[in-house]
Amino acid sequence: MEHSHDKSGTIMSKSETEVGSNPSPSNLPWYNRLDVVSVTFLVFLLAVISSIGALEGSGRDLDYLANLSRFLDKFLPPDVSVLDRTLEALLETFQIAVMATFLALGISLPLALGAAHNLAPSWMVALTRMALNVIRTIPSLLWALLTVVIVGSNSLAGVIALTFYSVGYLGKFFSEAFESTDMKITHALRGIGAKPLQALQYGLWPQVKPLIWSHSLWMLEYNVRSASIIGYVGAGGIGMHLALYADSPNSWDKFCTVLLCILVVVTFLDMLGESIRLRIKKRTGGKSAVKV
């Protein structure tokens, strides 16, 4: 064991010297003992305390239970007389979601190639990712408001709005899928004389195809839900009926019918989509789509 001498001549072992020069965490100031988790928790706690004011009522009517009772009296039972037009609007909503997802799929694939570090130069990756981030930052409802102003209150506005919004997410998902691939196959194909598109088709696409379909399916499910909401601002679909019936207390039973139909359709699509994604996951050995 190594020893050292202090000024008084006392012999100290090396381990004792290290302990003396490195104080235990309990002896450190409190701010030096904080880690990232503790700081994050403290910041969140302060944010919660400062947000208590959001729980205050409007002050107009604090009898919330009575309000709920009056609402339920007009909300139930549902008025099935509007079922036919509701189903027609649901079909339009589904068509909006399908067309938006299809267009976004075609736009996102080339953008994702430009956003993948293993496929594009750094400057192109930076520009493409910046564009995708900007597109993704704008909520689908705001995209709908913008498109309604430009093309009017119709289903085309909904298609354009959801296409832009979907491109932001699918471009991100697809680029991550491309970056997760094994490029050795693609490089080998290029080495034996394959053209760039051929190398992508036979070396890259088979690896990412399951994830591409899985992400696209998730986006379709999301767009069906979003298409039900953006119609509220005039972008076509079932949301326009929601807006019409919600504004009239005497039509809340019709609102209930529309809401129940949306619930049934969205639940069915979620179950169907989850089943398909599980099949894709089994075929690809456990890879699954990334959700947000």
Regions found by a protein language model. Name each.
Residues 132-166:
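Generic hydrophobic transmembrane alpha-helix motif, especially the helices
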